[in-house]
């Protein structure tokens, strides 16, 4: 699973927990048309 998180300054947490699911930061890109950064998170797998 993938989650996209918006940030105006490009600063993203290395990970966060939402509803008991841990998400790990993978990469980010700048959306020039909207004027903010988008961080890409993936679900952390306990395996």
UniProtKB/Swiss-Prot annotation:
What GO terms in the biological process aspect are recorded for it?
Answer: defense response to bacterium
| Keyword terms | Antibiotic, Antimicrobial, Secreted
Subcellular location(s) of the protein: Secreted
The record's principal subcellular location, in a coarse class, is: secreted
Source domain of life is Bacteria
- Can you cite an annotated GO cellular component? extracellular region
Family matches, as Pfam families: lci
What else does the entry mention about this protein? Heat stable. Resistant to proteolysis by tryspin and pepsin, but susceptible to pronase E and proteinase K.
The record's function comment reads: Has antibacterial activity against X.oryzae pv oryzae and R.solanacearum, but not E.coli or P.carotovorum subsp carotovorum. May bind DNA or mRNA.
The molecule here is called Antimicrobial peptide LCI
């Amino acid at each position: 699973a993938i989650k996209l998180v918006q940030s105006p300054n490009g600063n993203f947490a290395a990970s966060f927990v939402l509803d008991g699911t841990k998400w790990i930061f993978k990469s980010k890109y700048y959306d020039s048309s909207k004027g903010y950064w988008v961080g890409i998170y993936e679900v952390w797998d306990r395996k």
